[in-house]
Swiss-Prot record:
GTP-binding is among the record's keywords: no
Keyword presence, Secreted: yes
Top-level taxon: Eukaryota
Disulfide-linked positions: 33-76, 40-62, 46-73, 50-75
A GO cellular-component term linked to this record: extracellular region
Subcellular location: Secreted
Name of the molecule in the record: Defensin-like protein 98
């Protein structure tokens, strides 16, 4: 009976470790949307604009500007954590 418990624990540990190794790693840092990319009508059109800029950008935000009826697309990118910046 004891060996059954040990084997069950071993299988559970192996399953948990494999799930952790397979799952995508979280990006260290925060998403900042501060690069203007022109005007937009919706978030989906802004995402399309920013995705054409390359791998450094991860979508975009369509934000209202100071002019009525005009929205500005801001492309988003990840900024490293403060610990990462200090190591540079």
């Amino acid at each position: 009976m004891g060996s059954l418990r040990v084997s069950t624990v071993v299988i559970a540990v192996v399953a948990c470790l494999s799930i952790l190794l397979i799952s995508p790693t979280e990006v260290d840092g925060r998403l900042v949307c501060d690069t203007p990319a022109g005007t937009c009508t919706s978030s989906s059109t802004c995402n399309d604009q920013c995705n054409t800029w390359g791998g450094n950008y991860s979508g975009g935000e369509c934000a209202d500007s100071s002019f009525p009826g005009l929205s500005i697309c801001y492309c988003c990118h990840y900024v490293g954590s403060s610990a990462e910046m200090e190591s540079m």
